[in-house]
């Protein structure tokens, strides 16, 4: 059984998961196409973070919701540790983020992922997301999917 809870952006387990995600992404993409969000650069009011833990309390995955100035929000930092993949945790993370967005009456959720992350693209499609054009602050990037 897994649990999902909201955590502060400075949570040490969240920092560990995000560092694993950053290392993974740096192997896939050059720096100019690596759109990682440094959580410490975002105010607490702009960000909500969640973490998934296994039955032993071990951090298994994470995600975040970044509130944008135009009144929409972006799904960020979705990551599942490799040993926990294939258990529908991605769907649970996205669903939890969507609940947070709904509670904030956000009219639109967006996201960016990379072309080399086919499982992530498949996850977002299963969750009902469709490919669209780049949105601010992004510019079109052949290695990104929006």
PLM feature spans:
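Acetyl-CoA-dependent GNAT
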Residues: 2-76, 81-83, 94-96, 100, ...
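C-terminal "cap" of GNAT-fold acetyltransferases
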Residues: 2-3, 7-10, 107-110, 114-146
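Residues that form or flank phosphate/diphosphate-binding pockets in enzymes
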Residues: 60, 88, 119
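Active-site acidic-Proline motif in GNAT/NAT acetyltransferases
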Residues: 81-83, 87, 115
């Amino acid at each position: 059984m897994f649990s999902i809870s909201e955590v502060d952006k400075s949570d040490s387990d969240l920092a560990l998961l995000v560092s694993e995600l950053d290392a993974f992404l740096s192997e896939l993409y050059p720096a100019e196409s690596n759109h990682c969000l440094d959580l410490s650069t975002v105010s607490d009011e702009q960000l909500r973070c969640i973490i998934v833990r296994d039955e032993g309390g071990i951090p298994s995955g994470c995600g975040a919701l970044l509130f944008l100035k135009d009144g929409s929000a972006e799904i960020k930092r979705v990551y599942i540790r490799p040993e926990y993949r294939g258990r529908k945790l991605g769907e649970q993370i996205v669903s939890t983020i969507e609940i947070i967005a709904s509670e904030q009456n956000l009219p639109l959720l967006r996201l960016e992922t990379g072309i080399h992350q086919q499982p992530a693209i498949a996850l977002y499609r299963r969750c009902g997301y469709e490919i669209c054009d780049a949105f601010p602050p992004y510019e079109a990037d052949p290695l990104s999917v929006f």
